[in-house]
């Protein structure tokens, strides 16, 4: 008890820390191609379920943890922790070192743990507590799921695919793949990384494949840009009425063998906006929307979303970021999604004095930006997402929403950014989705 009490008292005095939080597409890696296609980690060597158990309570803080053994064979690997469904805000502590403090319990997050790990047993703790920005959660909707479900550790070689940004765009009658792969080299000197990819059509026909040798300076991330034609295939443009998906698989090669497969599906075409309307492939979307949050399991959500689509619903409006598989379902069924950051203060929304509404309290601007950033990067490669919402309908407006809008417009060049509480101001592309 004394050791944990000491840790917690020390953390109370610390400023919010999130330096090791990783903002990127949500994915994990597989040892075998077939496993990646099935999303089956049973034969992935460096993938460990994270299911911490309660250790003790110190005041209003619940300490949960798990001991994880790091064998010598993992020394050339970066170890990441994916956390979701924490229910409460948390501090992440590894071997008595603070890794990150997270106020948003609704948005899944990844963390780089390698700087804090050692060979042998490692103690990974979460200190579950009340959020220091609880006012941002007043209008949030809880997902009724098992705590920590879907959390895991996984490892990637120190030369690895760190992230990717994939698009299939139409040029005339031709579809073109635009694939940007962020490659990370955590060795001290320049290394050549072999990066492979292949792409299959919605009819399961191999269209293109290649392995590129890509030099990356030591301790840096660089971007490999791939541009290739997929042919005159406008019949495969993705929409709610034509949910055709390509299959891309990325991997690295070491010692002549493919490693660390990442597989995902991608729809062709673009989501844009004009004159206050959402567009898919240049055509206005006739909106029939429904508020929806995935509160159960994949199979139950699949059945619920199918039922909604059968009634004519074509756009879902979640209240906060959803499990990654929710977006897979929507990609596959042809359901549009307006992705929404977990910014849901519903008190004092009309009080525009500084500090009146949380959205006009500059002390919270870092938290607003962190939530928008986490929302955007993890799901930006999903075709179903046609727009981004900065927060709830009663979130208010002000300095923090201005900054959030500016940041998101700086990274997202096509899809609409919506602030439904803009109240006639400049920081929204569309007033609201009905």
Protein language model regions, located:
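Secreted/periplasmic carbohydrate-active enzymes, especially glycoside hydrolases
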Residues: 1-10, 18-324, 328-332, 386-387, ...
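Substrate-binding/catalytic cleft of secreted carbohydrate-active enzymes
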Residues: 315-434
